Amino acid sequence: MLYRIYSLFLFFFLSKSLSAQIVDDSTRQIYGLSSVQYQLEKDILNNKVKIYHPDSTLGTFALVDTIAKSSFQFQHLGNLGTAAKWIGWRTEEEVNTPLYFSPFGLYAFQKEHIKYFNTKSPFTNMHYVQGSRNFAVLDFTHSQNINERLNITLDINRFSASKQFGFTGSSREERLVDHWAVHVSSNYTDKKGKYLLLTHYNHLNHKQNEQGGVQGFETLDLSLATISPEYTDYQAQLASAYSREYWNDWHIYHQYKLAKKEGFTLFHQLDYGYQKMFFIDAAYGRNKASEVYPTSNSVADTAVLFVRYRSLNQSFGLKGSWKGFGYNAYINPRLYRRVGVEDSRNTTPWQFETFVGGRLNYATKDSTLVLQTHVKLGTNGGFLLIGKGVYRRFGINFKQIRRPTSLFEQSFFSEFISWSSDFNQTFTQELGTSFP
C-alpha cells in the first residue's frame, strides 16, 4: 500500500515539474533565418527599401564550380579556378576608362553583390566540398551584430585544384590553382536613422600554374596506350610558369537624410583599388620555342611580367523619392594609373577624369508599371544612356554606351609581345524585350 502511495506521489510530482517547463511558443524568442536580414547597396542608392533573408533551399547546393553557378555564361580552361571569360555578349554599364583585362576576376567577391547584414543573433554559414579530381572548396560566412545599430561580417571563399596532366614528379596531386578571396564588411545606422554607413574590404589572391596545353602529338608515341583515356600521362608545354592576380579594394558608402521624409538625402561613395598582375616563366629560355609564345628574339632566361594598378574613385550626390518617383544626381571624379614594375614602358602618369550623371525612376504602388532611366557623361568622351520599362511582366530596355578602350588594350610591353595602338572608343546600342 505504501509503495502505491509513493508511486502515485512521485508521478504527480514529476508531472507538475514537467508541465512547469513547457514554454508557450508565442512568448519565446525564436532566432533563425527570419531574424537574419541583409540589404544591397544598389537598392539603397536607388531609394529602394528592400530586405532579403538567407536562402535555405537546396536548389543550387550541388553547384560547386563558379562556372556552373553562373549558369555556364563563362568558359574556363576545363578545370576549377582556371582563367575564365564571358562567352556571350555583355554590355558593361559603365563609361570610365577600364584598367586591365582580368582572367580571374570572376572568382572575386563582386562589389554589387556584397551583403550588409543585420542579425538578431550570430549567423554562420559554411559549405565544404571535396571532389574526386583532387579539388576542394570552402565557403564560410559569419555575421554578428555588435549592437542593434552596428554589424560586422566576414566572408571567405577558398578553393584549390590539382593538375589533370603534365605532372613533373611521381605525385598525382600537384597543385594547379590556389585561391583565396576574403571580404570584411560592416554597416552602421545612428539612433535617429538619419545616417547610414556601409563599408567593406575586398581581397583576392589567385594563382594558376600555367601549362600551355598538351604537348604536340608529334612528340608522343601514338600507340594504343598513349591514346587511351589515361590522359594523365600527357605532358604539358610549360612546367615552370605561373600567373597571379592580387586585389586589395576598399569601399565606403554613406548617406545623411536632410529631412525626415525621403525627399533629400546626401550620399558619398569612395573606392580605392590596388591590383597587382604577375606572370613568371622561370624556364622561358627553354619554353620560348614552344607554340605558347609568339616568335621573339629575346635572349632572357626568365620572363617576368609585373604590373600594378591604382585607382581612386568618388561620387558625391543628392538623392530622394517622392510620390512614386525616385532620383539621384551625382558628380564622379576619378584618378588612375599603371606602374610597370619590371618594364618602365608600361608606366603611365596619373590620369584624371570626371563624370556627371543622374537616375530617375518611377513605380506605381503595386509595381504594375516600373520605369527607369540613367544618364552619365564623362570628360573622357564617355557617354551612357539607359532606359528600362516593365508593365505587368512585359519589359523593354534600351542602352547606348560609348566607352574608352582599356589601358591594357592601348599599350603593353614585354619580352615576347608588345603593342601600342590608338583605338577608337567602343560604341554600343542595344534594344531588348522580355516577356513571361
Feature-to-residue mapping (PLM):
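N-terminal start-of-domain structural block
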Residues: 20-79, 220-299, 384-386, 398, ...
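Outer-membrane beta-barrel translocator/channel fold
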Residues: 70, 161-246, 381-385, 392-436
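Membrane-proximal, glycine/serine-rich, low-complexity loop/turn segments characteristic
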Residues: 20-222, 257-261, 390-392
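Exposed, low-structure sequence patches enriched in small/polar residues
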Residues: 119-121, 244-283, 298-436
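Bacterial Sec-dependent N-terminal signal peptides
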Residues: 1-26, 195, 264
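A short linear-motif detector with a strong N-terminal bias
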Residues: 102-107, 130-134, 176, 230-233, ...
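Exposed beta-strand and adjacent loop surfaces of beta-rich binding modules
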Residues: 17, 151, 326
